[in-house]
From Swiss-Prot:
This is Major capsid protein. Residues 1-25, 33-52 are annotated as: Disordered. GO terms for molecular function: structural molecule activity. InterPro entries: Luteo_coat, Viral_coat.
């Protein structure tokens, strides 16, 4: 009887100590302070990196890429950079409606040829910073229709040194191909950097 009585308390003590040890282990496994630390650091880093692109209370810089497709060997037209840029709704119907002032600081115009090697002719472009021309007046800048090439224009050439109202165009780019057929020529792929100021 005594031996049975001794075994009983020992088991109870062992169970008690085991339960206590399990309870003490639980808060060690859940390391909440360490998890909270990295989350705050990551949150701060995201806030710093995305401030200019998410909130942008005072402005920022965006890069837009768009294309002008189905150019023919005898195509002509005008691309109006600003609120009239229908080829890039992300700019004309998007970001410019959220800011009072903007400036396009650079553009890269790539003519991507889809023409055959036998297609003759060239496509000329001209920058109009007065936004008044209705037809091409200069034939200095050109692309050979049968070859892919690109040209880059900085702020000095596109009236991009000063901010202006988001309700007016900054410049136009006129183009004209000198071919005599409607053969496929290619497309323009245009990349531009836009600075923004004063959110609405």
């Amino acid at each position: 009887m005594n031996s049975v009585g001794r075994r009983g308390p020992r088991r109870a003590n062992q169970n008690g100590t085991r339960r206590r040890r399990r309870r003490t282990v639980r808060p060690v496994v859940v390391v909440q302070p360490n998890r909270a630390g990295p989350r705050r650091r990551n949150g701060r880093r995201k806030g710093r990196g995305g401030a200019n692109f998410v909130f942008r209370p005072t402005g920022g810089t965006e890069v837009f890429v768009f294309s002008v497709d189905n150019l023919k060997a005898n195509s002509s037209g005008a691309i109006k950079f600003g609120p009239s840029l229908s080829q890039c709704p992300a700019l004309s119907d998007g970001i410019l409606k959220s800011y009072h002032r903007y400036k396009i600081t650079s553009i890269r115009v790539e003519f991507k040829s889809h023409a055959s090697a036998n297609t003759a002719g060239a496509i000329f472009i001209e920058l109009d910073t007065a936004c008044k021309q209705s037809a091409l007046g200069s034939y200095i800048n050109s692309f050979t229709i049968s070859k892919t090439a690109s040209k880059t224009f900085r702020s000095e050439a596109i009236n991009g040194k000063e901010f202006q109202e988001s309700t007016i165009d900054q410049f136009w780019m006129l183009y004209k191909a000198n071919g005599t057929t409607t053969d496929t020529a290619g497309q323009f792929i245009i990349t531009m950097s836009v600075s923004l100021m004063t959110a609405k």
